[in-house]
Regions:
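A detector of single, family-specific signature residues
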Residues: 1-357
């Protein structure tokens, strides 16, 4: 580790994050490299980093690559210490071609991005109600996916089952199929193809039932948490628990990091991107941003198109003007994002509740 004494006030730190360790580079206010440090991803490692950085001078700001993944723990620690933390994008290829690729190089590029003012994104808070909702929703989605895989596997087993078993189960709905198969008694040591198939099908059916119970428990917690965190959001036309959860997660616990409704629209990928040149003035579709939040806005738009009179009037007007359904939905998503931002901006998401037993 190389250290350079300096009297420059204000230290900027850049951190390249990994699962088990982080690499940090410190710069002074003039952009001079002061030192490099590698720490484990533990509380003691974070404390060592803060002590090391403050040894050069007062720590002003930190640029971290991956504040929502490998850098989440360090981000929480630094924010609790009152340090300004910025989200830094992955280094651009042109920078890597010029300076090479290594952990210290990436960390230095992160620090210089903060020092130059090009890294201005504030990381999401990960210690409040929205983080609780996110963890539960991620688990629920994986359970829903696993349940779908289970029922598909059960039906595939039925296709290749012996004819007698197929005849017994043919024509049953999914719910009745799972209920009937879960009660099979093939014995502990299947001795023929039909018994082995029954054993396998019963195992899959019971897995489906366990996953359904797990999903119900998670949905109960999500309904409660979302209703407590954002009752005004759930009360909006076309917004349900899952849609509200998606939008809350996109904004984060600290929704004040979004400076205005245009920033929220850009985050959700519903803000048209200028694509003008010379006398040609045009915009192109934004295919970036948080795609899950974009999907949530799409669901709200579809619900309002079928049930909300104000939206139906707007759709009829734009259709008469010659717009296609896709174009109308894009406009609706932008308007809906504006409404939702106003609600999110009025929320106070800083007191994590306790999970119900």
């Amino acid at each position: 580790m190389r250290c350079i004494p300096t009297d420059a006030v204000g230290i900027t730190l850049g951190v390249d994050t990994h699962k088990d360790f982080h690499v940090a580079v410190a710069l002074d206010g003039l952009g001079r490299r002061l030192g490099t440090l590698s720490i484990p991803t533990t509380r003691s490692g974070y404390e060592k980093l803060a002590e090391w950085a403050n040894g050069f001078g007062p720590l002003e700001s930190v640029g971290i690559e991956g504040t929502g993944s490998f850098g989440a723990g360090l981000t929480r620690f630094l924010r609790s210490e009152g340090t300004r933390v910025f989200e830094v994008d992955r280094p651009k290829r042109r920078d890597q071609y010029r300076s090479g690729k290594s952990d210290p190089i990436d960390a230095e590029l992160a620090a210089r991005a903060v020092l130059a003012g090009t890294a201005t994104g504030r990381p999401k808070g990960a210690d409040g109600e929205v983080e609780m909702i996110r963890t539960l929703r991620v688990t629920r989605r994986s359970a829903v996916k696993a349940r779908a895989q289970a029922i598909n596997q059960l039906k595939n087993l039925l296709i290749t089952a012996p004819e007698g078993l197929r005849s017994e189960l043919r024509g049953l709905s999914t719910a009745k199929l799972v209920a009937k198969v879960s009660e099979f008694r093939p014995g502990t040591n299947p001795s023929d193809v039909e018994a082995a198939t029954k054993f396998a099908m019963r195992s899959v059916a019971r897995r489906h039932q366990r996953l359904s119970e797990e999903i119900s428990e998670l949905e109960e917690q999500l309904d409660r948490l979302v209703a407590e965190a954002a009752p005004e959001l759930v009360a909006m036309e076309g917004v349900g628990t899952d849609t509200a959860a998606s939008l809350l997660i996109a904004a984060g616990d600290n929704s004040e990091r979004l400076k205005d409704e245009a920033a929220f629209a850009h985050l959700c990928g519903v803000a048209p991107i200028p694509a003008s040149s010379g006398k040609s003035v045009r915009h192109r579709l934004n295919r970036h941003g948080n795609r899950d939040a974009n999907r949530a806005l799409y669901v709200v738009a579809l619900c309002r198109m079928s049930r909300d009179e104000r939206t139906r009037t707007y759709v009829a007007k734009r259709t008469a003007e010659g717009n296609t359904k896709k174009e109308i939905i894009r406009c609706l998503k932008r308007y809906i994002a504006r409404e939702i931002y106003r609600v999110l901006a009025s929320l106070s998401l800083n007191k994590p509740p306790i999970l119900a037993p």
